[in-house]
Each structure stands twice: as C-alpha cells, then as structure tokens.
Design a protein with these regions (language model features):
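Conserved nucleotide-sugar phosphate-binding/catalytic loop shared by glycosyltransferases and other
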Residues: 3-9, 14, 30-82, 86-88, ...
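C-terminal amphipathic helix plus adjacent low-complexity
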Residues: 353-403
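Short amphipathic alpha-helix
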Residues: 20-31
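A nucleotide-sugar donor-handling region in carbohydrate enzymes
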Residues: 139-228, 253-258
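Conserved nucleotide-sugar donor-interacting segment of glycosyltransferase catalytic cores
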Residues: 92-163
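Donor-nucleotide binding loops and adjacent catalytic segments primarily
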Residues: 28, 184, 199-292, 326, ...
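A donor-sugar binding/catalytic signature common to diverse glycosyltransferases
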Residues: 18, 44, 282-326
Length: 403
C-alpha cells in the first residue's frame, strides 16, 4: 500500500569532480524510502544515473568551476550570468510549488560561496515560510578545505549563515576519524546542532559467485583531474608487465576531458594485460574483483576502498588551497587502512615500485561507521519530530556535538 511521503528538497552542486553527486545520490537512495525527494542538480549530469524510486531529478543550467576557481557555464546556451539568473528563479519556483517539509543543502555555506546568490534567497524563503516551517539542514563531508588566505573570515561567515538559517548540520563522518572543528574554526562558537551521521557508503553489493581477486585497478573518481595518474599508471604497467605479468584495469571516469581520453586510448592500443574503461556504474564490484587499488583519495573512492577491503595505494589530489584529500589520506594511513604516494613523487617508475610493494600490505579492519546514509534518514526524522528543540533529546551523544 502506498503511504504519504513528505517532500524533501535536496540541492547539490558538483564542480571539479563528481564526489558530491555520488554522495548525494547515495543519500537520496536512502531518503527516498521515507521522503519524496526533489534533487536540484547544479552540475553536469553523469551518464550513469541509477534509477531511484520517488525521486524527481531537476537539472539546473549546469555550472562548473575552473582551475582559477571561477564559475563557467557547461551549457553553451547560457552565459554564467544567464545561468545564475535562471537557476535562482527555478529554485525559488520549485520551492513555491513543492513547499517541502525538509530542505537539505549540500556544502553551503561551508563552500560554494560563489552560488550564494541562488542559495541565500532559498534559505530566506524557507525561513519566512511560517505555514510549512521546513526543517533546513546542511550536508557536509568529513573534511573541509581549511587553507584559504581568508580562512578565519570564511569560517566566521559560514558560522553566521548557519546559525541564522539552518536547523542542523549533518556531518557525514565517523567522529572518531574526523571532527568538524579539526578543519572549521570560526571566531564565535557555532550554536546550530551538529550531528555526525557516520560515513555515507553505497553499501556492499553481494555477489553470487566471488571470483579470485587479480590485478590492479586504477581510478580517479570522475576523472576530471586524473590524467597524470593514468599516464603514470600506463608507464608503471609497461615496467611491471615484463616480469610480473600483473594485469591492470584503468577506469578513466566520465569527466576526464575527451582529449585526455583519446590520448589514453592511443597509448594503450596493443598493450598486453591492460584494460581501459571510460566509466562504470559502480566501482565497488570492480574493486572486489581486483587484488590491488591505485587511486586518488576522494570521499567516495575511500568509501569503496573501505567497504571492499582492497589493499590500496592513494595518490591524493592537491591543487592550490585544496588539501582535503591529503588530510584524509594521512588519517587513513595512520590507521593502517591505506598506503600513500605523495603526488610530487608520482612517476611511472616510482608507481611501479609501489604497486609491487602494495602486494605485501594488509589493511587493518576499518572499524569505522559506514552506515551514514541510513543514519541520516533516522536523524532527519527525529529532527522533524523535535524541531523546536535545540538538540534532539533522542540523539546518542556519540553523534551529537555542538562546537
């Protein structure tokens, strides 16, 4: 029997990669069991989109962010200014039509400040809605970028917006691994309830028959900045194949620029033991079929590594102020969960050596909470039931923390 599901409006903007998209879709899959979800997608939609019941996908005029940290339009029909104006109106119109019970915004105001022009009007509208009185929540990953030149000012601004417009922060991490205050240090204490959900992992996909693990799997999330890793991997494979006959599969990712993809295709043509794939709908089954993993260290890649238990060498992506992956990699290495190769040392020869050494690495049991998607649903339900309380009394103190 069908039962009434309250409306939930989820906003997600991915820019450089697709990590935010993947995590938000994993959350959506869990949330759709209890809510009718409208997903406002602000970036380019990936080719592979798993079907989710009770999901309405609304693709906004897509925007990305370049290496200069400036917005650019991913639809030639719109300039950046035109896209921003259209997006703002679409978002407000969608809210007015849906009158959602829950508004869930990914990352903002801890990031995406260039999109404040479309998000602050939404937040103000939700706060003025005295009839629906929606629960307004922020969805955050485990580690924030904290190397900005104006970091103190940025953190204080984020704190002020959060305390003014949000009912709660959902941090998708195990607090034993990372806490928000490690990378977020406003001048004044945050008053908004902060709740740790555990990590949002896709959940293991049981296989009827598990073949023996064999070979190296190389990946870089969406692939947008994966070309240097893939080039080094091809060189490493050529070095190791002559003596070890260790097969390699490279999954380039849907966002690897087409020119880089064609370059890879040309390079691997005729190479024995090397398989090149553009993208796959799910990485975890492929990880579980391989004996070793070489990858960057994005949130979702790490979730797949931890769930699969595959011995992993991570080469964290670092660019300018973005040190999130390096921080995550260091924490994982300290727990004995991965091995690290510093990106400054990435060469074909060095990677070939580290791949062979990785065969002797046995990762420790993760011991981390990876059930964050289901826990997020429970937390939202409890927050709705106790919206007038500062901190829901039903929450376990292990997962509730006020900065």
């Amino acid at each position: 029997m069908n039962h009434y599901k309250p409306r939930l409006l989820l906003y997600c903007q991915h820019s450089l990669g697709m990590g935010h998209w993947v995590r938000a879709m994993t959350l959506t899959n869990a949330l759709s069991r209890e809510f009718r979800v409208t997903f406002l997608n602000g970036g380019r939609a990936p080719d592979h989109q798993a079907a989710v019941a009770d999901l309405d996908m609304l693709n906004l005029p897509p925007l990305g962010m370049g290496e200069d940290h400036q917005l650019y339009s991913q639809d030639e029909r719109y300039s950046v200014e035109e896209a921003l104006a259209a997006r703002k109106q679409i978002i407000l119109d969608e809210y007015a039509m849906l009158r959602p019970k829950v508004v869930l915004i990914e990352l903002f105001p801890f990031g995406r400040k260039k999109l404040a022009g479309e998000l602050l009007p939404l937040l103000k509208t939700a706060r003025r809605d005295k009839q629906t009185k929606p629960l307004v929540l922020c969805s955050l990953r485990d580690i924030m970028v904290n190397a900005r030149k104006d970091q103190s000012r940025h953190d204080e601004r984020a704190r002020w917006i959060t305390d003014r417009y949000f009912d709660g922060l959902l941090v998708h991490a195990d607090p034993r691994f990372a806490r928000l205050e490690d990378s977020f240090k406003p001048r004044h204490p945050l008053q908004t309830p902060l709740l740790y959900t555990g990590f949002v992992a896709p959940g293991r996909i049981p296989a009827a028959i598990k073949p023996p693990r064999h070979g190296v799997l190389v990946s870089a999330g969406g692939g947008m900045v994966g070309a240097p890793l893939f080039q080094a991997a091809i060189q490493a494979h050529a070095i190791n194949w002559t003596t070890e006959k260790l097969p390699m599969t490279i999954v380039a990712g849907p966002f690897l620029p087409e020119a880089d993809w064609q370059d890879l295709v040309a390079q691997v043509k005729g190479m024995a033991g090397l398989t090149l794939r553009r993208s796959v709908p799910a990485m975890q089954p492929l990880l579980e079929a391989h004996s070793l993993s070489v990858s960057q260290c994005g949130y979702n890649t790490v979730m797949d590594i931890l769930e699969s238990g595959t011995p992993a060498l991570v080469v964290p992506f670092v660019r300018g102020q973005e040190d999130e992956q390096s921080q995550r990699a260091q924490k994982l290495a300290e727990l004995g969960l991965v091995e690290i190769l510093n990106p400054s040392e990435l060469t074909g020869q060095r990677l070939a050596e580290r791949i062979l050494q990785l065969r002797d690495f046995s990762p420790n049991p993760a011991g981390l909470n990876l059930a964050g998607a289901d826990h997020t649903v429970r937390l939202i339900q409890e927050l709705r039931a106790s919206k007038n309380d500062l901190i829901p009394g039903a929450q376990s103190t292990e997962y509730v923390h006020v900065c």
